[in-house]
Amino acid sequence: IQKMANAVKNPKYAAVMDAYKNKKVVFIIDECHRSQFGKMHGQIKKHFERANYIGFTGTPIFEKNKGADGRTTADVFYAGDKLDSCLHRYMIKDAIADGNVLRFSVEYQRTIFAKNLAKGIDPEQLDGPEYCKRHKIDMEPLYHDDERIASIAKHIFEHHEQHVHPQGKDIYTALFAVDKIQTLGKYYDEFKKLNDEAPTDKRLKVAAIFSYEANEDMDDGADEHSQELLDRCMRDYNALYGTAFMIDTFDAYRKDIAKRLKQKDLPQVDILLVVNMFLTGFDAKPLNTLYLDKNLIWHSLVQAYSRTNRVDKVTKQFGQIVSYRNIKQWQDDALTLFSGDGDPNEYLLENYEYYVNQWIN
């Protein structure tokens, strides 16, 4: 959309753009839930007066999940009062039934326990906004406690093999999404410590990527400027893989990471630490696990989960989600919304105890 919007405005392309201004043209737009809500879409529509627009998305913007803009995907792709703006619906359940994507296995790990809380507070309800509001609980210091972060990093380090090396055969890759850059830096350092302490054959190749503000100030109490952290991560990456990326070659760094997650003839990245990048629109069949220490809702949740469920080798039987926050209600709400008010459990494997009982009986 950026290229077309620029072409419409740039005098250099005026002759070409004007030639199509009054012609019947069709724009086919992928990932239309996230790219068409700004000014650029309007500028393009204004120029091409007779154009039609067809958008594809796995996670439309509905009334329930619309943003501050107030519009839905149907509003942006309005087809007139007599027509349904949605031409066709192909739900996740259809894709699963057709064998085009996999179901999800979701595992929740409790990381905040009663010993860290005031008397009478139930740790199992801490991620419920209403419960926290009623009991005046601020989750932020609990989530970002250094001891908790170290514990989660250790849990991932110790159990990563079982997630990405199913049946002792093929090896897959993983994302670890956290809530902000400062948290990412803490996890990155914890993984470095764990690697330093581990035998060579047990070490994990951990990389990190995030967008940063070039003119960032330090008023938020950050321990390290985000650009300095990114530069440090890139230097470690260069040492690990024999590359030479710098801040001003960020896009090449991003592309190299993508190739390694996809296992494209390069030594792979085992775990990629992210905040928002790679959680939408990135497809890598060898990626089978998403670790989460981040609250996600609606389309952001489904998009993030869907990084893991692309069909690959026979040993990849489902996409794995390991969440260190209790986002089950948000998960169920999102899966219900994007299934046309269906059953969210259609997309999920049962828990471990269910399959044990099935086997016993």
Give a label for each model feature:
Residues 1-29, 34-43, 253, 274-276:
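Conserved RecA-like ASCE ATPase "motif II neighborhood" in helicase/translocase motors
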Residues 7-25, 48, 249-269, 284:
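Short basic/glycine-enriched coil/helix segment immediately N-terminal to the Walker B
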Residues 31-33, 278, 295, 308:
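Conserved Walker B
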Residues 31-35, 47-66, 99:
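Conserved helicase ATPase motor motifs in RecA-like P-loop NTPase domains
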Residues 66-171, 188-203:
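Interdomain helical connector at the RecA1-RecA2 junction of SF1/SF2 helicase-like NTPases
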Residues 136-274:
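Conserved C-terminal RecA-like helicase domain
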Residues 273-274, 278-295, 300-303, 319-323:
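A short beta-strand element within the Helicase C-terminal
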Residues 312-361:
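Long, hydrophobic alpha-helical segments
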